[in-house]
Amino acid sequence: MTTPPSTPGEVDLGAYEAWLFDMDGVLTKTALVHAAAWKEAFDAFLKEESARTGKTYAPFDPESDYEKYVDGEPRADGVRNFLAARGITLPEGEDSDPPTAATVCGVGNRKNDLVLAVMKKQGVQDYEGVTELIAALKSRGVKVAVVSASENTVAALTAAGINQLFDARVDGHTVKDLHLAGKPAPDSFLQAAKDLGVDASRAVVLEDALAGVEAGRAGHFGLVIGVDHHDEGDSHAYADQLHEHGANVVVRELTELVSH
């Protein structure tokens, strides 16, 4: 297919060999959980930093800062990105650092502990249309993979009851083990396509993050679908951004892809 479709109604579910799904904000309603956990972890650190240095305390914004610095990024990269924007550099530390440690790993571990606690208490909900879309794809012989920077991918998908649906998984552990660059680099999506034995031009990327659709474009995937779950008032502006950053098609719900 030389010209990708530009509207949901033009998407042929059987036209590509594989679909590669981001997790947070596409498959599962965990993006808000992650944003809140990042805020609590960063704000605790920033308050400590303010008390230590006398700098004005400015809290983490769970919308703009989340989207700009941490959404779709491996945990350590998210810590580095945000703190660099605040002019703060921390020692890397070790994976085993306690959540109170003033290191990249320590701040990341604090955030991770918060996410796991919320998932354990509240569970994880998948978005409407996930199981229907994947069933429709599989009925056409299409392979599906989940691609996420989260090291909690299996836990989140299992909690949502959809872990068994995927033919391949590239997650935060894969990224770390294979030294893959984070989004907007296309490495994680390219690895998923490789694991499925499919050329990037014959695969679809589904992403809600701007860095994610950029990764889809950078990897020369056959089709990049942006998923915009923003409220109606914010939707058009974000949909435009998704298009600008590389999405061929933008949907508000996955049901739009199976309802035609």
Stretches with model-predicted labels:
Residues 131-135, 209-212, 224-238:
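Short glycine/proline-centered loop/turn elements that form peptide/ligand docking sites
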